[in-house]
Amino acid sequence: MNKTDVIVIGAGVVGAATARELSRYNLNVLVLEAGSDVAEGASKANSAIVHAGFDAKPGTNKAKFNVAGNRMFEDVCRELKVPFKRNGSLVLAFGEEEEKALEDLKAKAEQNGVPVEIIDQAELRKREPRVSEAATKALWAPTGGICCPYELTFRYAENAAANGVEFAFDAKVVEVKSKSKLKLRVEGEGEGEGWVVKTADGREFEAKAIVNCAGIHSDELNNQVSKTKYNIEARRGEYLMLDKDEDGTFAATMFQVPSKMGKGILVSPTVDGTVIVGPTAEDIGDKEDKATTYEGLEKVKEGAMRTYPALPLGKVITEFSGLRAHETTKGDFVLGEVSDAPGFFNALGVESPGLTSAPALGLYLAGEVASKLGASKKNEAIISKDVSYWPKTREMEPEELAALVEKDPSFGRVICRCEEVTEGEIRAAIRARVGARTLDGIKRRTRSGMGRCQGGFCTPRLIEILAAELGVAPEKFLLSRKTAPKELREEAAARLVSAKAQVEDYDVIVVGAGPAGLAAACAAKDNGANKVLCIERDDAPGGILQQCIHNGFGLHRFSEELTGPEYAQRWVDMAKERGVEIVCGTMVLKVDPTRITAMSPRGGLKSYRTKSVVLAMGCRERPRGALMTPGTRPAGVYTAGTVQRLVNMDGIMPGKKVVILGSGDIGLIMARRLTFSGAKVLACIEIMKKSSGLMRNVVQCLNDYDIPLLLSHTVTDVEGREHVTGVKVAKVDDNLKPIPGTEMHFDCDTLVLSCGLIPENELTKKAGIEMDPKTRGPKVDPKTMATSVPGIFAGGNVVRVYDLVDWVSRDSEIAGKSAALYAKGL
């Protein structure tokens, strides 16, 4: 039996904060977590708000610890290097009745010691011009803030581990008993002093004290040891997340007047630059049901539009839900030592404002435990402040970044293009003391896969890195979010030194070396450009066609039918024949008409001077979040392009029973490819009245293999907790709304999304180029492919999504010719 002084059950933000505070004492501390990582429960799925404290009932634990935690938050985040912003919060009133509620909130705030003021409509509109004109007044709370809850949890755990706290994951506690009931006697100790904890896999641990931070399951543990029973109801909240394009929509967190169920639908900026919308509040019986629902997401949209009538649903990048631990008998945080269970300490029913309260709760609980055990504090000089912090390259100055890449080239290899996360950051996240063991773990530590494509591009690379670092077969990361536990490893922080970026000169620089970029480069050369450079973020030129092993390309451009790799190679050869320089594995960070800034693991940070630029970054797939498909969030949901890469390039089959949502060409082609590889494609589901793909692909990829195409249907629910087990499908009406009573069910292990492509235009927007809201690409002159910024041209799918790659090449040649003429001053 493993013995320790203190066991903390649960590695959410409260458990991690408590562990960190306990690490300041001369105690042996073990954290047992049911999930495979920290922040697996409410700490990963909440509003990320640091509440001011005006809403909590005066005199309650919620009020006391909310205010105390808020005051500690800034210092804690600075110590742990966690992003935090005190942006303030506004509670909106719509009419006289709700204005009275603001007065009640103001009175509560004054009793709780929270500074607030009520502002009129004119002042509200001055501060927040985009707020609804129906809002008549607002309560302003300047001490409200925003943070990153999962990063805070991880950094708490990292600092605790640096001070000797041990963490055991996949360790669900199923039984807690006092030694007195087990009639255990340990030499040198009295009978009944301490506790024995048993996990689901049969492991047993012995401790002098237990801290119950088990979230929605904390009532179950309390009720095993105490006559005082509590009941926790899982309260589900559903959210939408908007793209970083919406950053700056509101400065403050925008609340509505709260109800007995919660603080209502909010619209708030995040520290990461996105906008969060939600949550709903629904009491459910299943403590594991984190599925989103059609009805819930509709409520989020409806509620948010009350605050923000212009809510841009086209900018939704993901949807998710979280479960709050709502205690029904007391309605407050239940804290401290249980009177009839000495040595057992509760942090029970910690719902909102639990995140805000976490620093104060950790301090309080650790103090209570230390006092009970008579533990002394460690010498302050030996307490580690290290949190295994690694550089965030997207936030670094150019000279600083260049020096880092020179020292460690992996920090120059961008894996996640949306969030500009490098291989070095990902490997550091895995190698941390409390390191990432899953795709979700990497996501929460680095933001890889959290951007607008939601992992559509980077997932295969992340799997490759995880598998190499952890010695686990890549397939395991497709089957489940959990992997076998591995010993924690330590890594020293990289030291940064000064260096200067290198500069080279060109006539035309093309961003992207897919068919569009290569065609533009060839045309530039053919029209008199002397030095032409293609910069490609992938490790080889050719773009997405390298994974399109089917034929059907080139009939219009080369008068012969080619496979994707053959078509790409044709352009690669033509570019090389003309003397076009191609640099791969290089991520462009900034575009100006006369200068390109890029980064690579080999060349570090480089600056290229140029006379003109062609943008040819291609497009990306619409992820599940943008579709707002309800259901759970298990492994087994992939975009068609991701499946195409896994099967065609990595030799990995994602599943055996497949449903395809959407009838885009990639999805249709993958239906045939998966069938060839031994999978059973059950159906292709299309919400519109006709397929969005080419008719020849419908015939050759579906009809020829007896795969049904269900038009005017959509997926209404994704089932499965760890991995997809099935989907529900329903007919839709003329407004694309599901028709009740038309549902059908498919047992499947994989859902493939083929629901359209979107031009990849992050660099375009950064360059200040005018965008076309219809195509979601840059506005261009069709005769020259010139953008609104002189000297910058664009070609291919970055402008609009084409049906055929031949037309991509054709229009990109126009862009390349125009760029060459511009460079010559013509």
What are the functions of these language-model segments?
Residues 24-44, 527-545, 685-689:
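Glycine-rich FAD pyrophosphate-binding loop
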Residues 48-123, 127, 136, 264-265, ...:
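Dinucleotide-binding Rossmann-like beta1-alpha1 core, especially the glycine-rich loop
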Residues 20-24, 80-86, 212-344, 353-363, ...:
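Active-site substrate-recognition segment that forms the wall
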Residues 262, 271-272, 283, 288-414, ...:
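C-terminal catalytic lobe of FAD-dependent flavoproteins
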Residues 111-117, 122, 126, 134-135, ...:
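FAD-binding core/adjacent interface of flavoenzyme oxidoreductases
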Residues 83-91, 105, 125-163, 194-197, ...:
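Helix-loop-beta segment of a Rossmann-like dinucleotide-binding subdomain
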Residues 180, 197-198, 218, 230, ...:
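A Rossmann-like FAD-binding core segment of flavoenzymes
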Residues 4-30, 508-531, 670-674:
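N-terminal Rossmann-like FAD-binding beta1-loop-alpha1 element of flavoenzymes
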